[in-house]
Amino acid sequence: MKLKKLFLLILIVISSVISSNVNTNEGRLNTDIKIVSYNIHSGVDKDMFPTLFDIIDFLKNCDADIICLQEVNESAKVGFQVSSLKEELGMNSHFGANVVNLNSNYGLVTYSKYRIIRQNHVYLSSSKEQRGILHTVIDVKGKNVNIINVHLGTNKEEQEEQLKELQTFIEGLGNEPYIIAGDFNAADINLDDNCIDVAKTLDKSNTLTFSLGIERIDYIFVSQDIVPINYRVIIKKLSDHYPIIAKLRI
């Protein structure tokens, strides 16, 4: 009888452990995150009026898990924007300067509520102003998720080469999930079939993201194992671009 009770107790413990592992895995598979991508134009609007504090307020109110910013200027002249945003948002961050001058560093920054476990900055082939991608790996409840913050050039030939380099970089990630967000400076961007265009998938690709144009030039792409839930373009005239926001299921 004692052996039978002991056997039953062992079965209960094993069942409990298995159930716990299943629930943990389900939690990892069903984590919803909010991401914002925004070219902040060095903290000025299209008329060059300073808007950095309004941008900070907007981003704080978004309550996003991940924020990818382009055209961020870390200099005494316009304010140390990377540092100011980090302090106000209270998030982990990684900055990559595409352009380094004597008095300023200008480029990409990614903020994350999740722990950053790896990061690197890659220069893209550029014939005019230097462009690049900022790669950050975050830990989302035990799962590595690659965040790729992008700013491409404005010249068509330059863009084609930069897209090839971006594609090669993505292929190097293997099977890890990824999110690509940023300013591509071109309409009708298509990556390979493994990349999901979030706006197009949710039938919202006709919304412009650039206040001086009539087309969508800012994008969020995800790998096949990430599910787009919703997508919005926010008409905020704090930059020459509009911010884009997506909810994704990891």
Predicted regions and their residues:
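Internal catalytic-core helix/loop-beta-alpha segment
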Residues: 130, 137-140, 148-156, 160
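Surface-exposed cleft-lining segments at the edges of enzyme active sites
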Residues: 42-44, 120-124, 150-158
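Metal-dependent phosphoester-hydrolase catalytic domains
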Residues: 19-23, 121-122, 137, 156, ...
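Active-site beta-strand/loop signature of hydrolases that rely on acidic residues for catalysis
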Residues: 34-40, 55-78, 136, 146-150, ...
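Residue-level detector of structured alpha->beta connecting loops
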Residues: 63, 90, 113-115, 174, ...
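N-terminal, active-site-proximal structural segment of metallo-dependent hydrolase catalytic domains
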Residues: 2-87, 101-104, 108, 164, ...
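Structured beta-strand-rich core segments of catalytic domains in phosphoester-bond hydrolases
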Residues: 27, 47, 70-144, 232-235
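Short, solvent-exposed loop/turn segments at secondary-structure boundaries
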Residues: 46-50, 158-161, 233-234
